[in-house]
């Protein structure tokens, strides 16, 4: 809006009201509510200098009526912004009669002219835009912002009543031109360009990154920062109490029920850490037991470079549910280093990481194992004396289980081959990578070792004795199996007819051999009837039996059985072959064999006569 328009408006209103002597300069509180504020140039000379003091007061209710008729009611709706309620009834003469205007206290925020009388109550719903230096008794504002206590003032950060500027509102920064306003709105600054704030703590609930709409909503909503800060303090106190009550216990309990103290809780006491006096007593007691048992078990378990001293190391003794922790007075080792049964080894001491100790837990006691290190002799005997001193009854170890298995096999299977170095390996088990001490007293260990040697010796002797018998039986079985496999391979290469021929031939050869062996009655043949003497008759009968078979049978017999000169041996071999290779007796059922026998009968008889003549 240009300055010319403002001047013309001011002249029009001034002439009208001066003529009736009803001119009035509006109070600075009568503003547009931030909607369309009218800025009047300060360069224009004030016209209220010509007006007397009588024009500064209301004389009658005539102007109130004209005001209501001319401008009407306020067209802009009011907003309930949490402040005092704004009265819409501006036509009452009681409120306007008491209204006075003093030129010395008139602010430059409103219409900057003494005779420029805006006759409408620019009621606003935003009390922060009101001039705090003006006295408002017309019901528009029941109180000023300066008089509001801090506990009840929602917007106390605009409390800058002692400051007077030529700008539109108090408390706002100097706005040079439209670009400054545009930059301020684009940046969405929640402080709205304020240079200095009296109550910066109350702005903590505003976010500088909030959008403009959210910022306006946060300013206009009925939100009380004091209550919000109080709620935040209450929440912080609750969190602090929770953290104090739930302070982490530095004594952490692991999965095995042990208590492990953290580095930050060194000053605190743990229930599993016993007094030093009890530890010293246990150490002395174990020292005495070690000295007594060392003399009895020294000849069984020896390590190269074993020291006679007693090394105070941290390990756990558990017997019948009673646990004792023997700790080094200089250094505490957490119980997590003591592994349970079936748990791999863990490094026990940081100074000697090569030595690994496993303390196995059981109902009857505990068993300690020492894995020696090849680095030095002292490290190899790291816990050997302790292990000898705390030997107690327990379940079988791996070595004991293997020994029992070997003994059982020795009793049940004396013919099996056992490793000859079994005794040497078990005898030198203390010098292997893992030294395992048997779970018995020294006397019992001596007896077990002697029994072990005897069992190993018996195994070796039984193996030597049974090796010859087993070898002979295996040779026989292997010979027969080899022959059978060879015969099977040959037969697989023949056709079905050849296989049937061989079967029938073997059957006839077996029958003839059986007849010769028993010496039964033989039918007389025409070819042998001319024989007179008994000896000739014997040979003639033998040849007759042989001639009952065909040439194929004889060739098969010569191929399969090498018949010796003695007939008795030949018959025995034939009988053995018959019993070892039984055949199905079907010689007469085969028509091909009968045809062959009839065709070869004429050829076999002359041949038999030639043989008998040669014998004579």
Swiss-Prot record:
Residues 594-608 have a biased composition (Basic and acidic residues). Keywords: Activator, Biological rhythms, Nucleus, Transcription, Transcription regulation. GO terms for biological process: circadian regulation of gene expression; DNA-templated transcription elongation; entrainment of circadian clock; regulation of DNA-templated transcription. The keyword Nucleus applies. InterPro entries: LNK (IPR039928). GO terms for molecular function: RNA polymerase binding; transcription coregulator activity. Interacts with CCA1, LHY, REV4 and REV8, but not with PRR7 or PRR9. Unable to bind to DNA, but recruited to the evening element (EE)-containing region of the PRR5 and TOC1 promoters through its interaction with the DNA binding proteins REV8 and REV4. The evening complex (EC) nighttime repressor is implicated in the temperature responsiveness by binding to the LNK1 promoter. Also responds to some extent to a dark/light transition in an EC-independent manner. This is Protein LNK1. The gene is LNK1.
């Amino acid at each position: 809006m240009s300055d010319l328009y403002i001047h013309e408006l001011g002249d029009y209103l001034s002439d009208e009201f001066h003529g009736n002597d009803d001119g009035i300069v509006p109070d600075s509180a009568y503003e547009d509510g931030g909607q369309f504020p009218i800025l009047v140039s300060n360069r224009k000379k004030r016209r209220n200098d010509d007006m007397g003091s009588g024009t500064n007061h209301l004389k009658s209710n005539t102007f109130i009526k004209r005001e209501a008729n001319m401008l009407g009611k306020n067209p802009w709706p009011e907003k309930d912004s949490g402040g005092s309620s704004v009265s819409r009834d501006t036509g009452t003469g009681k409120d306007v009669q008491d209204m006075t205007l003093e030129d010395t206290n008139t602010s430059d925020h409103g219409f900057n002219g003494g005779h420029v009388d805006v006759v409408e109550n620019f009621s606003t719903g935003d009390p922060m835009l009101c001039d705090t230096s003006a006295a408002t008794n017309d019901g528009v504002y029941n109180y000023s912002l300066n008089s509001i206590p801090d506990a009840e003032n929602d917007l106390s950060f605009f409390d800058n009543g002692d400051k007077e500027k030529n700008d539109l509102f108090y408390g706002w920064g100097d706005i040079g031109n439209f670009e400054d306003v545009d930059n301020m709105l684009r940046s969405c600054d929640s402080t709205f360009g304020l240079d200095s704030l009296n109550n910066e703590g109350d702005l903590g609930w505003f976010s500088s990154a909030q959008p403009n709409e959210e910022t306006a909503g946060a300013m206009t909503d009925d939100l009380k920062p004091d209550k919000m800060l109080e709620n935040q303090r209450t929440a912080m106190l609750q969190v602090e109490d929770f953290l104090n009550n739930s302070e982490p216990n530095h004594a952490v309990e692991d999965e095995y029920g042990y208590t492990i103290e953290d580095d930050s809780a060194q000053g605190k006491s743990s229930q599993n850490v016993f007094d030093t006096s009890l530890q010293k007593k246990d150490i002395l007691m174990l020292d005495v037991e070690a000295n007594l048992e060392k003399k009895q078990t020294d000849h069984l378990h020896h390590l190269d470079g074993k020291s006679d001293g007693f090394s105070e190391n941290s390990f756990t003794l558990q017997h019948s549910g009673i646990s004792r922790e023997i700790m080094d007075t200089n250094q505490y080792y957490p119980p997590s280093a003591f592994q349970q049964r079936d748990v791999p080894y863990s490094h026990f001491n940081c100074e000697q990481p090569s030595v690994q100790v496993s303390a196995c837990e059981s109902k009857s006691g505990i068993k300690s194992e020492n894995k020696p290190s090849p680095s030095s002799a002292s490290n190899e005997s790291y816990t050997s004396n302790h292990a000898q001193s705390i030997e107690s009854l327990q379940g079988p170890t791996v070595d004991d289980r293997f020994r029992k298995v070997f003994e059982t096999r020795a009793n049940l299977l004396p013919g099996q081959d056992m490793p000859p170095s079994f005794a040497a390996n078990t005898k030198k088990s203390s010098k292997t990578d893992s030294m395992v001490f048997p779970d018995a007293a020294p006397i019992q260990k001596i007896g077990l070792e002697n029994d072990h040697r005897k069992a190993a010796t018996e195994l070796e002797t039984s193996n030597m004795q049974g090796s010859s018998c087993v070898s002979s039986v295996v040779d026989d079985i292997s010979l027969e199996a080899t022959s059978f496999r060879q015969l099977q391979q040959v037969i697989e290469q023949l056709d079905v007819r050849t296989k049937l021929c061989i079967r029938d031939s073997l059957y006839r050869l077996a029958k003839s051999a059986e007849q010769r062996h028993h010496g039964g009655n033989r039918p007389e043949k025409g070819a042998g009837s001319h024989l007179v003497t008994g000896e000739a008759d014997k040979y003639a009968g033998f040849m007759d039996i042989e001639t009952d078979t065909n040439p194929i049978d004889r060739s098969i017999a010569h191929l399969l059985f090498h018949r010796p000169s003695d007939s008795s041996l030949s018959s025995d071999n034939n009988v053995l072959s018959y019993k070892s290779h039984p055949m199905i007796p079907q010689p007469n059922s085969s028509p091909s064999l009968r045809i062959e026998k009839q065709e070869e009968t004429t050829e076999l008889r002359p041949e038999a006569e030639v043989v008998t003549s040669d014998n004579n």
